């Protein structure tokens, strides 16, 4: 079953370390089955409960998955090898259009905002036991959510979108539970879910968001949570349309116990309104990060949700970091209040470059997608070859393997720091690397 490798150890910690180390070293491959617990216990001369504890630890770390009577096996993409490792090393002289970062020229200066926040902190320092939320941040965030039709609910603050998503998942789910996620989708979520000991269930995506039929199938087969990106979906640029939102709400209405998590990380950089699903199920959370519009290093996201979910998130947060710095919260309030970011201008800048690249590719017979945000997704017949040929031509793009499970091969190009005068050159290189072909669905 394991080929040449033999699991060793007498304690649960040693057994799990033996497996995890073998996975990290490539001695146990993704998808490889592990021995049944009783069989391994007999081989090692230990109690079956010891092996069960080791397997439980491995599930919780995202190294293995267990599928009932089919037993346990190494995850197709173990958490020990994060998707961020699937990238192109950018040599000198090659333009990097792969990293997904915002255009730093469109980010606001933080100096004045932090001066104002620090001055207030000097005047009234935040101490242990003080209110963890900045009242003005909560007021402004809730008002913004109300304007966008997000269901009413209490507000919490987390250290970025991924932190918020992790806290919501762990507030409701247990290792072994299944989570429906977009495919292709955000690589960090595809890493996070198995790292929490949860199972990924892929859901196809088109330009209008998750495919309702795939969502229905995933929920019918037992997925206990669904993660949806409202706008600027990474990597495809999809945005949930009004019609798609209505259809997905109808699907979710038949599964009221499913945990719904919406990621609106594109808030502040997109020109399409959101069509939220919030409130379609009993437990839900809606997350908004300031990273793309104001700067990734601020590490702040606002979330709202049903009272039970938000209360659990706040309670667990109190036992860990305690709170997100009120200095940072006050700085974000200052940025909002001062109008430091012109969301329409930022959205127009990204949109102009994105649409120009898609049009240039279409003129060369290359199918590409990017309805919102700063990324363009290009389905390709040979992902490895296309990425390598583009690198040779002087362009580093993101391999689609970082973002997909069952979806077809592709690659992502980030336009945020691309100059308009470069677009024809990029399109020429892509067309040369992948060849022209008829448009097709990318999921």
Task: Report the location of each language-model feature.
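N-terminal basic, amphipathic alpha-helical segments
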Residues: 1-118, 126, 139, 318-325, ...
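Residue-level detector of anion-binding/catalytic polar loops
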Residues: 64, 178, 199, 259, ...
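Short beta-strands and strand-loop turn motifs
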Residues: 97, 202, 227-231, 261-262, ...
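Conserved core of the PLP fold type I
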Residues: 124-256, 268-281, 438, 442
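Conserved Walker B
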Residues: 264-266
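Conserved core segment of the aminotransferase class I/II
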Residues: 286-347
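Conserved glycine-rich beta-strand-loop-beta hairpin in the small C-terminal domain of fold type I
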Residues: 350-358, 366-379
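AMP-binding (ANL) adenylation modules
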Residues: 402-405
């Amino acid at each position: 079953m394991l080929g040449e490798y033999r699991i060793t150890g007498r304690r649960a910690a040693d057994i799990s370390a033996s497996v995890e180390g073998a996975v990290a070293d490539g001695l146990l491959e993704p998808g490889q089955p592990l021995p049944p617990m009783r069989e391994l216990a007999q081989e090692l001369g230990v109690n079956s409960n010891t092996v069960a504890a080791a397997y439980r630890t491995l599930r919780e770390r995202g190294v293995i998955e267990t599928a009932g009577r089919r037993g346990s096996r190494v995850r197709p993409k173990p958490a020990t090898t994060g998707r961020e490792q699937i990238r192109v090393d950018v040599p000198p002289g090659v333009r990097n259009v792969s990293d997904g970062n915002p255009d730093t020229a469109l980010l606001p200066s933080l100096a004045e905002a932090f001066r104002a926040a620090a001055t207030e902190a000097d005047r009234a320092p935040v101490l242990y036991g003080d209110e963890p939320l900045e009242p003005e941040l909560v007021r402004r965030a809730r008002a913004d959510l109300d304007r966008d039709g997000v269901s009413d609910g209490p507000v919490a603050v987390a250290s970025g979108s991924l932190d918020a998503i992790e806290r919501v998942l762990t507030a409701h789910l247990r290792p072994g539970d299944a989570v429906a996620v977009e495919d292709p989708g955000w690589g960090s979520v595809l890493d996070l879910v198995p790292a929490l000991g949860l199972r990924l269930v892929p859901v196809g995506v088109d330009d209008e968001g998750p495919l309702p039929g795939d969502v229905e199938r995933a929920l019918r087969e037992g997925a206990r949570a669904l993660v949806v990106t409202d706008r600027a979906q990474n990597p495809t640029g999809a945005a949930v349309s009004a019609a798609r939102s209505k259809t997905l709400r109808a699907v979710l209405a038949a599964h009221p116990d499913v945990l719904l998590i919406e990621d609106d990380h594109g808030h502040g950089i997109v020109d399409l309104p959101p069509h939220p699903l919030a409130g379609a199920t009993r437990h839900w959370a809606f997350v908004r990060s300031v990273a793309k519009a104001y700067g990734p290093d601020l590490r702040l996201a606002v979330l709202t949700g049903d009272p039970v979910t938000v209360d659990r998130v706040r309670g667990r947060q109190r036992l860990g970091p305690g709170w997100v710095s009120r200095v940072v919260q006050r700085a974000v309030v200052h940025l909002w209040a001062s109008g430091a970011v012109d969301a329409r201008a930022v959205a127009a800048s990204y949109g102009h470059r994105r649409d120009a690249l898609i049009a240039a590719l279409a003129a060369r017979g290359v199918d590409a997608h990017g309805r919102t945000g700063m990324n363009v997704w290009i389905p390709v017949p040979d992902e490895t070859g296309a990425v390598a040929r583009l690198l040779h031509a002087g362009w580093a793009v993101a391999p689609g393997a970082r973002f997909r499970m069952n979806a077809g091969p592709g690659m992502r190009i980030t336009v945020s720091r691309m100059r308009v005068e470069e677009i024809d050159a990029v399109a020429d290189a892509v067309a040369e690397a992948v060849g022209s072909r008829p448009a097709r669905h990318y999921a």
